[in-house]
């Protein structure tokens, strides 16, 4: 139990007790408004055009405490005639202030008291999106079952706020936070719809992103603890693990009770062949064990979300499939394990044997139809795939138009260069190339055929298909067979930290 006590003390040491006074500090809202600060965090700047006033921020907080709905109410208009300010603007400023105040004790890069070595160490945790695929290629060929899990969203956003209670023990801070949410975010309803959560996340991206990531981090901390110390106890006994405050004390008491009252001994087992991967709002659990243990973890997840986080989750949101028979989607790719069968002839003395060898290979395929839907949504083609022009870019110069298309093509090419089959990637590049030609023809008020005759189809946009080969030729010998082999193999770019918007569309 010593390791449990160390884990508990480490968790308690991170609790912060005095965050409320920071809400009334002017520099907090200056940081929220500053373009440079927003650029340093991985959230896009909201682009405020107005100047903020700390006096109005303090007045808003005072009015929330007074509950004067003649001045501020959930149904108020965006422009309050009494004060003459934009309520949405100041609600975003206050929400950014809340996010910054809570981020200060939790993110090392925001604290000036840390040593430089620790700051550098914190940035090493930022890893490429593509770093996960070599791991999957190495591990998934030895596994049998995969569980595709959709992380449920809370029925009420206040559940996300309540999770902070285990780490931040400042009652006035949470009282003010709830007043703000009920006054500005219309949280009076018992159940918050997914559309309302989406609207709130768009208006307050930084604040919502912090709350959601904290929710995911909290459930993963419990899951990883149970993963490292899994028990063979019955499922009904799992409910006592949910209350985090007395988590470890109850676990120790449970072991003592079962050891005294039951004849069979309590044993703990570790499962080294189980792997967990999370991306966006989904996660994947893969294992080599029998389906029984995968179903066990499925029920653990459901009871964890329902019993501890008050989040409704249905069993159909967790699918358990055999890797050799089903494919799953991950970060814009389709992945499945393919069985390669080969026959080897073996001869011993005068006897000849035919031995069948079965090997596994992870196939990583570019999904052509979702990408075409994404291109159609971005107005590069129609829903069936034929390219169309981009009239909104026609006001730019020819160089800017080509550069825009080339950057999109380069990003998609880098992201999908790890695919097993490049045919789908070539189709996407072909659509972008023709869309670029049609956009240029639209700008010059000409047909595509006339424009190609005047400009020369051989030289125009040739870099769309030759850039990758030119880059590889600078690194490797100029041998056609070498370039052909590199073009067929998977190339993972370990400097990709963000996925393209076209990749995120599902």
UniProtKB/Swiss-Prot annotation:
Keywords: Chloroplast, mRNA processing, Plastid, RNA-binding, tRNA processing. Pfam families: Intron_maturas2 (PF01348), MatK_N (PF01824). GO terms for molecular function: RNA binding. Its main location: plastid. InterPro entries: Domain_X (IPR024937), Maturase_MatK (IPR002866), Maturase_MatK_N (IPR024942). It comes from the Eukaryota. Signal peptide: none annotated. GO terms for biological process: mRNA processing; RNA splicing; tRNA processing. GO terms for cellular component: chloroplast. Transmembrane segments: none annotated. It is found in: Plastid, Chloroplast. Belongs to the intron maturase 2 family. MatK subfamily. Usually encoded in the trnK tRNA gene intron. Probably assists in splicing its own and other chloroplast group II introns. This is Maturase K. It comes from Trigonella foenum-graecum (Fenugreek). The lineage of its organism: Eukaryota, Viridiplantae, Streptophyta, Embryophyta, Tracheophyta. The gene is matK.
């Amino acid at each position: 139990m010593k390791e449990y006590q160390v884990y508990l003390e480490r968790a308690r040491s991170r609790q912060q007790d005095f965050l409320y006074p920071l809400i009334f500090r002017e520099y907090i809202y200056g940081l929220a408004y500053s373009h440079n600060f927003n650029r340093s965090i991985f959230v896009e700047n909201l682009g405020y055009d107005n100047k903020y006033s700390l006096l109005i921020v303090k007045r808003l907080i005072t009015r929330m405490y007074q509950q004067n709905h003649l001045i501020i109410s959930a149904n108020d208009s965006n422009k309050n005639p009494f004060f003459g300010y934009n309520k949405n603007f100041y609600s975003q400023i206050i929400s950014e202030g809340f996010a910054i105040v809570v981020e200060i004790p939790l993110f090392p890069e925001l604290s000036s008291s840390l040593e430089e070595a620790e700051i550098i160490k914190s940035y090493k945790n930022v890893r490429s999106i593509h770093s996960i695929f070599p791991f999957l290629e190495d591990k998934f060929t030895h596994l049998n079952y995969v569980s595709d899990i959709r992380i449920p969203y809370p029925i009420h956003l206040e559940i996300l706020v309540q999770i902070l209670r285990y780490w931040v023990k400042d009652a006035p801070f949470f009282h003010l936070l709830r007043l703000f949410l009920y006054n500005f975010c219309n949280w009076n309803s018992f159940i918050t719809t997914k559309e309302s959560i989406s609207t709130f996340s768009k208006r307050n991206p930084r604040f919502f992103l912090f709350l959601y990531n904290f929710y995911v981090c909290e459930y993963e901390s419990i899951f990883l603890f149970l993963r490292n110390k899994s028990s063979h106890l019955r499922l009904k006994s799992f409910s006592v693990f949910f209350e985090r405050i007395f988590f470890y004390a109850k676990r120790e008491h449970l072991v003592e009770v079962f050891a005294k009252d039951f004849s069979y001994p309590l044993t703990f087992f570790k499962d080294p062949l189980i792997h967990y991967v999370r991306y966006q709002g989904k996660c994947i659990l893969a294992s080599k064990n029998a389906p029984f243990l995968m179903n066990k973890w499925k029920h653990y997840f459901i009871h964890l979300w329902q019993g501890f986080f008050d989040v409704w989750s249905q069993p159909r949101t967790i699918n358990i499939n055999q890797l050799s028979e089903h494919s799953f989607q991950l970060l814009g790719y389709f992945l499945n394990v393919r069985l390669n069968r080969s026959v080897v002839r073996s001869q011993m003395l005068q006897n000849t044997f035919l031995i069948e060898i079965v090997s596994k290979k992870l196939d990583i395929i570019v999904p052509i139809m979702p990408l075409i839907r994404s291109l159609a949504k971005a107005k590069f083609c129609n829903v069936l795939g034929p390219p169309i022009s981009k009239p909104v870019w026609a006001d730019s110069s020819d160089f800017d138009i080509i550069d825009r298309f080339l950057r999109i093509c380069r990003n998609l090419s880098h992201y999908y260069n790890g695919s097993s089959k490049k045919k789908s990637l070539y189709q996407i590049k072909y659509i972008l190339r023709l869309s670029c030609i049609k956009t240029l023809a639209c700008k010059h008020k000409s047909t595509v055929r006339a424009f190609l005759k005047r400009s020369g189809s051989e030289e125009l946009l040739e870099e769309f298909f030759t850039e990758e080969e030119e880059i590889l030729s600078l690194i490797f010998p100029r041998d056609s067979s070498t370039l052909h082999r590199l073009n067929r193999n998977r190339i993972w770019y370990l400097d990709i930290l963000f996925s393209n918007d076209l990749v995120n569309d599902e």
